[in-house]
Amino acid sequence: YDIGTDLRHELTHGYLHSVQPRIPLWLDEGLAEYFEVARTESGHHADHLAHLAALHRAGQLNLELERLEQVSDPAKFEQTDYAASWLWVSWLLSRPDMTTALAEFFAALPSDASTAPRLSAKLNNLGSDHQRLIREYLEQRIAKAPSLTR
């Protein structure tokens, strides 16, 4: 148990909800998971990476953003969803073009009960093959983690 990790995670939620109470669950959890790790780790979440690597090796990996966007009940958000959300946020923040798209998406979120836009639609409109790119990003992250390539 690490109180620092929990504090960083919960403070991220608190900050996000003070700015945007209608943030989609996947983005809320993805950002909290990304920022819960110590600053020296630069968003690298070894546990999530190991979990995703195991699913990837077993051929059971589903990184579809569209699937994550459909989950709105926190009780139905599973370990794989947290890990995939972290990966999406990590990838989005690693690329200036995607960071801009994420910021624009965040700014467009409604503050009322109206239907929120979907980031997957925005990425599709940008013409990016985000499913291929996120998978390649994961494979690169796995290759850089010596404990996962043995």
Regions found by a protein language model. Name each.
Residues 1-2, 19-150:
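Acidic/His/Gly-enriched intrinsically disordered linker/tail segments
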Residues 2-12:
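Short alpha-helix carrying the canonical HExxH Zn2+-binding catalytic motif
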Residues 12-13, 33:
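A broadly conserved amphipathic alpha-helix scaffold signal in soluble, globular proteins
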